[in-house]
Structure formats: structure tokens, C-alpha cells
Amino acid sequence: MTRKPKPPDEYCVTAFNSMRANLYRWGKPETDIRSMTRQYYVNIHDSGKDNIMLIIEKAMKYKLSSSKKTTTDDHYTRPQAQAYMIYDNPDKYLSSYDVFKKIFFDARKTIVVAKEENDLFRNDTTNDGYNFNIKTRSDKLYQKHGVKLYRYSGSGKWTNRTFTPVSYDDMIFNDEALLNEERFIN
């Protein structure tokens, strides 16, 4: 059975409408903030991914050796932090679907990483439902952990692909989202 491709625009519309509908709850002491920011994150995650053809060295080694160790796709731009930015600036992000859509599709970008590295990156963020904290801005996280990035090309078997070392500058970030992250750094 062939799977029907996920329609990312549908997930984007759902996130936009859900966030607009729940905006009145934002900032109220009784509101579990995580329940609101997850609306954005879950729709990003469930909408699929836009792989930017980057892979971390350890994941590359796993793929090339057909290792039993697992890899995953890291939504490296921290969509939950972006949800705070959207709720805090509804006049900008929730009044125009086109503006929202750009942020949404920026957040769908992924990099192939080893599962244990993804766990390490995840530990850089804490969220208890009311307090959201990060230790390192997204554009510095991979550097902090000393991972090496490669751009890959080709398709099919990983052993048939070409890998080229690249700098961290090849990662694509939204500047407004990065500035927003600074308020969560502790």
C-alpha cells in the first residue's frame, strides 16, 4: 500500500487556526504554556520534514556501515521556542497567514543526526509547562557539542552518496527566531 503524502499546508492551517483560537489564554497564570506551544510543535512534526541535505558525522558513519544504531531527523530550529515568539507577537504572526506560513515552513527544516546526539540536543531544553529554558541558542548548539556537519548528495543507498564537509553556516535559521531564543537562555 502506498502512503499518501502528508499535506504540510493542512498542518500549517491547523496550527495557525489553533493558535489564533487559543490566543486569549496566553499569559494567564492558570494556563499550562506547554499545552499551547505544543500545538505548533506537534503540527510542525506531524506535517513532515524539509531535509536540508545535512548530516552529522556520527549519523553518516551509522548510515555508511549499516549500523543497528539509529538516526533521526532533528528539527534543529526549536519550534517550541518559536511558538512563544508567535504568541507574544500575535499582531505580526497570527494576523497574516502568509507570515505565519513562512515561520512554519522554516521550522520544518531537519538535519540527519544520530539518536543519541538528538537526545543530547534535547537535554539543552527544559519545559515544565510554565518555564521554558534553553542553555544554548540553536545556531550554536551543534558547535557546543563539537559535531561535524556534512552535506550529502545523491539518492538510494547511503554508500552511493557523496559527502562534503560544511561549516555551521550551512544551517538555515530565521534571525527573528534566534533573537527570540536569547530570552530563554539561562
How does the language model describe each region?
Residues I44-K49, Q80-A81, N118:
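Short alpha-helix boundary/capping elements
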Residues M1-K68, T125-N127, I134-S153, K157-L179:
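Nuclease and nuclease-like effector domains acting on nucleic acids or nucleotide cofactors
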Residues S66-F105:
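Histidine-centered nuclease catalytic patch
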Residues T72, I111-K115, R151:
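A structural signal for short, well-ordered beta-strand segments and their strand-loop junctions
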Residues I86-K92, T126-K135:
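"Short basic amphipathic alpha-helical interaction patches in structured regions
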Residues K102-N133:
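Short Cys/His-centered divalent metal-binding micro-motifs
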Residues N180-N186:
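Long, compositionally biased interface segments
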Residues V13-N22, A81, F100-A107:
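Charged, low-complexity, helix-prone segments enriched in Lys/Glu/Asp/Gln
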